[in-house]
């Protein structure tokens, strides 16, 4: 009888152990699935070694995808097919996603490294109090030129590009707002102008630039400049920075009429499945050392004040890429234009592109 009870007790103990082991494996599987983090960013816009470092430190597996335009990113978030946990929209797209109630309200207590950010780049008009977004990188649109090819030129005005001596030697970034803004700026209008007449005037004025334009290009613009396929370019500051800092023959200027001051940001979409992981990732990127490493790799200007102090002096003190407060007074941040005006910009840009053929 005693042996019988021992067998029963042993069976019960074994059963309990089996249940505990089964529960442990299920729990581990659930934890693993929850610890995937879906990140959606611009191409070539993060030092991938930092992602590996984050994975090693946290045990969270990062599923990393890229996009090539705000519109493509916005469409995917609206569609909701993939539940991205962190995305990187520009300022005017933050406004659009915010209006559509597609962004999570941020808990700053979960991002302690937010203290590293420069107050000059916080609480901006597109997101007061940074309720929905945290700045990641910022920059401008300006003129990059070869000083050896054009030693007597300063390119301090958009109007300088129209001179016939630059025939077939100017490269333009492939962006509707960036190029139409050039025409608007030159005519004294706002970069966020919605007046169809003004947009049409800017387009008409750009047609006068056409003989000087060699091409409207994408990521290959750097290679084309290095291969002397163009000696003047309208580019984002992050494209210009590596060329200027590595080769004294280049210079980058913001024309006196003004230009765009843009911001790319980190946000958490409403549909995010791993919001805690998203906060960890954002906080990780805002760490001073991580941000400095990322900034040197990407090449754009960082709003992270603590990180900036770790950058080489020639980088952090370069006013061309870290414009002073006074300089910023003549720069404009993009706003959401609304679909009608955005269509007007795109149509005018397409007309201009067609005129180059």
Language-model features: where?
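Periplasmic-binding protein-like
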Residues: 199-208, 246-270, 316
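Early extracytoplasmic/lumenal segment of secretory-pathway proteins
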Residues: 7, 22-96
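Mature extracytoplasmic/periplasmic domains
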Residues: 269-329
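Ligand-binding "clamshell"
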Residues: 98-106, 127-131, 242-254, 316-318
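Extracytoplasmic ligand-binding site segments that recognize negatively charged/polar headgroups
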Residues: 83, 88-229
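A ligand-binding cleft/hinge motif common to bilobed small-molecule-binding domains
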Residues: 93-96, 226-227, 231-249
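Short beta-strand->loop
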Residues: 104-115, 133, 249-260, 270-272
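Conserved C-terminal helix/tail region of periplasmic/extracytoplasmic solute-binding proteins
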Residues: 325-357
């Amino acid at each position: 009888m005693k042996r019988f009870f021992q067998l029963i007790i042993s069976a019960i103990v074994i059963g309990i152990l089996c249940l505990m082991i089964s529960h442990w494996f299920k729990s581990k599987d659930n934890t693993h699935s929850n610890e995937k983090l879906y990140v959606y960013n611009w191409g070539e816009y993060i030092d991938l070694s930092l992602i590996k470092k984050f994975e090693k430190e946290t045990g969270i597996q990062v599923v990393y995808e890229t996009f090539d335009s705000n519109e493509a990113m916005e469409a995917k978030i609206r569609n909701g097919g993939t539940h991205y946990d962190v995305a990187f929209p520009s300022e005017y797209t933050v406004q659009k996603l915010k209006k559509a109630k597609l962004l999570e309200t941020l808990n700053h207590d979960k991002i302690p490294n937010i203290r590293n950010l420069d107050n000059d780049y916080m609480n901006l008009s597109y997101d007061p109090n940074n309720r929905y977004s945290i700045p990641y990188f910022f920059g401008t649109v300006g003129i990059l030129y070869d000083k050896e090819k054009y030693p007597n030129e300063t390119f301090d005005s958009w109007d300088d590009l129209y001179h016939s001596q630059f025939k077939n030697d100017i490269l333009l970034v492939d962006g509707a707002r960036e190029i139409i803004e050039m025409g608007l700026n030159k005519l004294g209008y706002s970069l966020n102008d919605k007046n169809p007449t003004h947009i049409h005037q800017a387009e008409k004025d750009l047609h006068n630039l056409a003989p000087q334009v060699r091409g409207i290009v994408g990521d290959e613009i750097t290679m084309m400049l290095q291969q002397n396929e163009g000696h003047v370019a309208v580019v984002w500051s992050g494209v210009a920075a590596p060329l200027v800092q590595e080769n004294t023959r280049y210079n980058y200027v913001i024309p006196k009429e003004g230009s765009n001051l843009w911001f790319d940001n980190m946000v958490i979409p409403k549909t995010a499945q791993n919001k805690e992981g998203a906060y960890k990732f954002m906080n990780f990127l805002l760490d001073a050392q991580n941000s400095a490493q990322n900034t040197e790799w990407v090449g754009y200007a960082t709003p992270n004040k603590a990180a900036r102090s770790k950058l080489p002096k020639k980088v952090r003190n370069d006013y061309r890429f870290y414009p002073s407060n006074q300089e910023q007074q003549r720069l404009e941040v993009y706003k959401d234009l609304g679909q009608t005006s955005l269509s007007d910009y795109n149509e005018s840009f397409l007309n201009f592109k067609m005129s180059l053929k």
